[in-house]
Amino acid sequence: MLRDDVLDFSEGSAVRMKENGEEVFFGFVFKQQRSKEQLISVTAYDQLRYLKNKDTIVYENKTADQFLRMLAADYGLNTGVLENTGYIIESRVEENSSLFDMIQNALDLTLTNTGEMFVLYDDFGRLDLRHLSSMAVGRQGAYLMVDEETCETFDYVSSIDDNTFNKVKLTYDNEETGFREVYIAQDSGNINRWGILQYFDTLKKGENGQAKVDALLKLYNKKTRNLKLTNVLGDNRVRAGSMIVVNLDLGDMKLKNFMLVESCRHTYKESMHWMDLTLRGGEFVG
């Protein structure tokens, strides 16, 4: 932007962005850069920026949403919808960690013990935590769909080389009995196809070993599928964590299903609005 006598702001000033009356972004100025030509470049972040704060925290018997609510109260952050994550974390020590990492650890524990994924984001000045099933863009019969007409180019990769496991083994050293408990879940069909790809870890006191190996196998016993889309027609509802329908012919395979948005970059230029998306998941048919 160009400097003038109307704009008066500094670090910490609130920034609101709307497009055609639609709320897009609410945050605060963190950095400004000025050139000799009086051009000003401004960097603003939403409330998620404050989750970079570091601390040491001990908590007991809280779900991830309860822990997030506690942190938000301690740091003066506004919250919106915080859906019940269900899984109770018996005891945890977070030492010299960012609030981001603490929350991610709580959500990871929920995911690996239940198979349920939750998404944290800032919705125009309010921290929301929602189940993945609540993150579809649009509504039934009118979901946002990306196809060959709405994106310029794509790059697709499928793999069993990263975060794919067809056998899960967890152990727990039971001090009361003096025995090591071993829990295993596996998919013999995929072991025959890919060989043994084993995930191993130890259990903490209070964790349900059988439930956790079953949840982990369900989570990891599949190919990873990643898709990058460039210059997609912009939609302000799309953010990291959204679920969008993708309908693309990849040559020998056709994709038509929901995919998870891992990262999203919106570009606004005059009357144009584009997105670059990184997606994962989805089922391939045909």
Predicted feature descriptions by range:
Residues L2-V6, Y59-K62, L233-N236:
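Short, surface-exposed ligand-recognition loops at beta-strand->loop->(often short) alpha-helix junctions
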Residues L7, Q104, E116-N221, R225-E270, ...:
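Acidic, small/polar-enriched beta strand-loop surface segments
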Residues E11-S13, R225-L227, M275:
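A generic structural signal for short beta-strands and their flanking turns/coil linkers
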Residues R16-A44, V245-D276:
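Short beta-strand and beta-hairpin "edge-sheet" elements
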